[in-house]
Swiss-Prot record:
InterPro entries: APOBEC/CMP_deaminase_Zn-bd (IPR016192), CMP_dCMP_dom (IPR002125), Cytidine_deaminase-like (IPR016193), tRNA_aden_deaminase (IPR028883). Belongs to the cytidine and deoxycytidylate deaminase family. GO terms for biological process: tRNA wobble adenosine to inosine editing. It comes from Agrobacterium fabrum (strain C58 / ATCC 33970) (Agrobacterium tumefaciens (strain C58)). SUPFAM superfamilies: Cytidine deaminase-like. The keyword Hydrolase applies. The active site is at residue 55. Catalyzes the deamination of adenosine to inosine at the wobble position 34 of tRNA(Arg2). It catalyses: adenosine(34) in tRNA + H2O + H(+) = inosine(34) in tRNA + NH4(+). The gene is tadA. Binds 1 zinc ion per subunit. Zn(2+) binds at residues 53, 83, 86. The keyword Zinc applies. This is tRNA-specific adenosine deaminase.
Amino acid sequence: MAERTHFMELALVEARSAGERDEVPIGAVLVLDGRVIARSGNRTRELNDVTAHAEIAVIRMACEALGQERLPGADLYVTLEPCTMCAAAISFARIRRLYYGAQDPKGGAVESGVRFFSQPTCHHAPDVYSGLAESESAEILRQFFREKRLDD
């Protein structure tokens, strides 16, 4: 459990960093054999790319670093429940385990919304563990959007 907490803490660092760059504060860390292979926050505004979610970024970085298109045996830690696009990427990458913090009833696609991994079109479903650092993950998002509303 201490290892899981450590990796989620790194994802929270990435989320905070994303928020400081005026990105929606979501962070992700990809781990293989107990080693961090990639870590990132959202980069959609920085790259002007709607697909530059934290999950997609770490999958791309890890595939490049390892020289392979799939990541069997890898674990992904994310501060927010992945959306449909990210859930599909997780499936295609053959991620072994997904750990996420806060649920996303509006945009999530794992235990909310379309429940992507339960669909017959899903090729691979990771083991899913939700609620890891849930309150911290949710608070980072709440604070970010609270400040956005004050700025408007």
